[in-house]
């Protein structure tokens, strides 16, 4: 929920939005400003004085009204200017790390009401967002673009390492030589890529209309990464149906960077004992990830195959007649599965 509020806050003030245009005009004029988004009862409790406007929002109106000392109150959707020149009187007992009066007031109002409050520094020419305990200072578009491009370059390197790790895992799965260490390494690399993705997403939200190219690059670089992670978990998790692959991946997402480097923690999340010696234990994949790579093979059929044969090794060694006996598989599909597995193995050996 907190993340959703942060996303909405960053998107609402991204370059190209009407609100950002108004903020930039105030910034250039060096008048400073204090803007509250929303007019709930909780927000109006801290508002005193000022005058009602209740007119459609426009960047020019926001700029003109900011010339007065008081705060400006906008509607929740930012489409109407409700009040101007209002005084904000939050509870002075609420702790604040800010020194300036405008920013201290903004922080306290945000903490007391959970509203998005925007403070524009007259002296430093900085736009700062407050919402609950969240605080974020907006940077110049050129600075964010530079950071985003650096993050994309890092993501490219991490994706290349992930692809090699997954290819090696695929090869080991065909040879039935996987250990828990191989599984942990693959899941670790998946999460590392997803963490960089989340960092770049924040830059994209903040860039708004300026972030289209970065967004396209990101989409290409993270294609199928989360799906691969979920399928690996399906292949190796010992946990019951109450612990879904999505739930396990979400758990790993909450870990610190240090915890993510601990392979024994990763295998413990899959339901194995957490000792270091367990990492050398051989394991056999159920076959979800490999079977998912065969074209036009429905999820229901993959599930029936795994339920019938138990693991990838048994599926690979099954005859066409045995495959044909599985629900949802006729002779044509049975041959397609055998041929698909053969091609995948040849491609893996060729790539390596």
From Swiss-Prot:
EC annotation from Swiss-Prot or TrEMBL: 2.7.7.85
Catalytic activity reported: 2 ATP = 3',3'-c-di-AMP + 2 diphosphate
Cofactors: Mg(2+)
Keywords assigned: ATP-binding, DNA damage, DNA repair, DNA-binding, Magnesium, Nucleotide-binding, Nucleotidyltransferase, Transferase
A Pfam match: HHH_2
Residues engaged in binding ATP: 70, 88, 101-105
One GO-annotated biological process of the protein: DNA repair
Annotated SUPFAM superfamilies: RuvA domain 2-like, YojJ-like
Chain ranges of the DAC domain: 3-143
Any one GO molecular function term: DNA binding
InterPro entries: DisA, DisA/LigA_HHH, DisA_sf, DNA_integrity_DisA_N_sf, DNA_integrity_scan_DisA_link, DNA_integrity_scan_DisA_N, DNA_integrity_scanning_protein, RuvA_2-like
Purpose of the protein: Participates in a DNA-damage check-point that is active prior to asymmetric division when DNA is damaged. DisA forms globular foci that rapidly scan along the chromosomes during sporulation, searching for lesions. When a lesion is present, DisA pauses at the lesion site. This triggers a cellular response that culminates in a temporary block in sporulation initiation. Also has diadenylate cyclase activity, catalyzing the condensation of 2 ATP molecules into cyclic di-AMP (c-di-AMP). c-di-AMP acts as a signaling molecule that couples DNA integrity with progression of sporulation. The rise in c-di-AMP level generated by DisA while scanning the chromosome, operates as a positive signal that advances sporulation; upon encountering a lesion, the DisA focus arrests at the damaged site and halts c-di-AMP synthesis.
Assembly information from the UniProt record: Homooctamer.
Family to which the UniProt record says this protein belongs: Belongs to the DisA family.
The protein, known as: DNA integrity scanning protein DisA
């Amino acid at each position: 929920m907190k993340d959703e509020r942060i996303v909405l806050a960053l998107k609402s003030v991204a370059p190209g939005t009407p609100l950002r245009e108004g903020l930039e005009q105030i910034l250039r004029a060096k008048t400073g400003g204090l803007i509250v988004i929303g007019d709930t009862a909780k927000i109006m409790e801290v508002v005193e004085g000022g005058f009602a406007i209740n007119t459609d929002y426009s960047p020019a109106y926001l700029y003109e009204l900011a010339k007065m000392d008081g705060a400006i109150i906008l509607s929740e959707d930012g489409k109407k200017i409700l009040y101007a020149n209002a005084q904000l009187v939050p509870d002075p007992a609420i702790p604040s790390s800010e020194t300036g009066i405008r920013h201290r007031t903004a922080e306290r109002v945000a903490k007391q009401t959970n509203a998005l409050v925007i403070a524009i520094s007259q002296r430093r020419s900085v736009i700062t967002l407050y919402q609950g305990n969240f605080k974020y200072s907006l940077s110049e578009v050129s600075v964010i673009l530079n950071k985003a491009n650096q993050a994309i370059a890092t993501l490219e390197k991490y994706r290349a390492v992930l692809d090699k790790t997954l290819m090696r895992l695929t090869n080991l799965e065909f040879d039935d030589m996987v250990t828990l260490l191989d599984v942990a390494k693959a899941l670790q690399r998946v999460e590392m890529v997803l963490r960089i993705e989340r960092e770049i997403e924040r830059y994209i939200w903040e860039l708004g209309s300026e972030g289209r190219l970065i967004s396209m690059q990101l989409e290409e670089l993270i294609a199928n990464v989360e799906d691969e992670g979920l399928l690996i978990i399906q292949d190796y998790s010992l946990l019951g149906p109450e612990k879904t692959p999505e739930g396990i991946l979400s758990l790993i997402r909450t870990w610190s960077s240090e915890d993510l480097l601990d392979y024994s923690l990763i295998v413990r999340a899959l339901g194995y004992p957490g000792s270091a010696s367990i990492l050398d234990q051989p394991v056999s994949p159920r076959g979800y990830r490999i079977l998912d790579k065969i074209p036009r093979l429905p999820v229901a059929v993959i599930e029936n195959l795994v339920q019938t044969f138990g693991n990838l090794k048994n599926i690979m060694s099954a005859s066409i007649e045995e495959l044909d006996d599985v629900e949802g598989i006729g002779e044509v599909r049975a041959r397609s599965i055998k041929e698909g597995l053969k091609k995948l193995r040849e491609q893996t050996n060729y790539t390596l």
